Structure formats: structure tokens, C-alpha cells
Regions:
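Accessory interaction regions appended to the cores of large information-processing enzymes
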Residues: 20, 25-211
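N-terminal amphipathic/basic-hydrophobic helices that include classical n-h-c signal peptides
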Residues: 1-32
């Protein structure tokens, strides 16, 4: 269970031992449960039509899957493994807003499809990285992720970059939007199971083969 300090105040304290119990008023930090007290999961997809209106922009679609959790949780273990276990075609990289300025909470990105060419790699390490990083920091700035918890949280973000992606501005903007929405969903524990049960039979997936 994770805790975080709030404002200082007076509480009644009872300390027991083999010799008895002492009770009295002491000035200590009050503690309340952390907002992010366990591993949370978030997902979001952003897609629009191609600029020439020929259909959905499947080349530049952003689909984010992420986990966020506190120090000591499986999220920290996953963060360390993702960052250090590099393989050909599958790589982990820290989310940074600029060189020498990694985001807080510490965030590692990984590609969900094999990187097949240099352009795709640059898109992952450029516009996608910037979009994810800015989304994380904006979630801290707007209070979605409490600032006082940020130093002790870890985020792992799966990013989809198609090998035919051709509009870097969309990669950056859509991965920003998808990451921000996924984080908000995770922290809010959305969607609720009752909502999924109510809607899933009538739902439509943009890439489904059939209804």
C-alpha cells in the first residue's frame, strides 16, 4: 500500500509496547492513500481521415498501451526490463522533452511493431518520443498524476509506428493525444466493467474483420 504526506496537523497517537501504552497529541504528518497506489492500465487510439479524404489514416494511427505504478510494484520491474533488455527491432527508450531532460514520472517507451527502416526509427525517437513526453508532463501539470507522487512512479508506454508512416506532425500530435487519454483512463480506472458490459456488443472496432 502506498501513502503520501499531506498537510501537517495534530493527531492522537498511541504507542504500545511490552511495558504498556502511551497516548497523547503529537504534531506529525498526516498521511492519505496515494492516487496511484498500484499498477494501473490505460489504452487509447487516435485516428482520423487521410488529408486527401481517401479513408482512415492507417499509416499514422496512434495506438497507445501503457502501465503506470509505484516504486516497488511490477511497473518498476517492467520499466527496468524494457529499458535494459534491448533486442534487434524491439527497443526501449526514455521519454524526454528535450536532450538531458527526461520526464517525471520516469517513462520508458517501446515499439509494438518491429522497426524496419531508418525513417521509422527516427519517427520513434523524434515525433513519437516528443508527443509521449509532453503528454506525461501535461498530466502532471494538470493534476492527473499528482506531482508529489511523480518521483516514485514508473510508466511503460507501447507505441505503434507503421513502417509506412508518412506525416511526422500527425505522429507527434496523435501519440500525444493517445498517451494523455490513456493516462487519464488509467488513473480514473476507466472504463468501468459495468460500462464495458453495457456497450461491448454494440461496439465497433476500426480495424475489425466483421461485426
Amino acid at each position: 500500500m502506498a501513502w503520501r504526506p499531506t498537510d501537517a496537523g495534530f493527531l492522537v497517537c498511541c504507542l504500545s509496547s511490552n511495558t504498556g501504552c502511551f497516548c497523547g497529541n503529537v504534531d506529525i504528518w498526516r498521511f492519505e492513500m496515494a492516487v496511484i497506489d498500484r499498477v494501473l492500465v490505460g489504452e487509447a487510439l487516435v485516428i482520423e481521415e487521410r488529408p486527401d479524404h481517401t479513408g482512415l489514416d492507417l499509416y499514422n494511427v496512434a495506438h497507445i498501451d501503457l502501465i503506470i505504478g509505484p516504486r516497488g510494484s511490477a511497473a518498476e520491474d517492467a520499466f527496468c526490463r524494457t529499458l535494459t533488455d534491448q533486442k534487434q527491432g524491439v527497443n526501449g527508450l526514455l521519454a524526454i522533452v528535450a536532450p538531458n531532460m527526461m520526464v517525471k514520472p520516469a517513462t520508458v517507451m517501446f515499439n509494438k511493431v518491429t522497426i524496419k527502416n531508418g525513417r521509422q526509427a527516427v519517427q520513434m525517437f523524434g515525433p513519437a518520443q516528443r508527443g509521449v513526453a509532453m503528454a506525461v508532463m501535461d498530466c502532471v501539470a494538470d493534476g492527473t498524476i499528482p506531482q508529489e507522487e511523480a518521483e516514485n512512479l514508473f510508466i511503460c508506454v507501447g507505441v505503434f509506428i507503421d513502417s509506412h508512416a508518412d506525416i511526422d506532425e500527425r505522429i507527434q500530435d496523435w501519440n500525444y493525444r493517445a498517451t494523455k487519454q490513456a493516462l487519464k483512463n488509467a488513473v480514473a480506472r476507466e472504463p468501468k466493467v459495468a460500462d464495458v458490459l453495457k456497450a461491448y456488443k454494440d461496439s465497433v472496432h476500426p480495424f475489425q474483420a466483421k461485426k
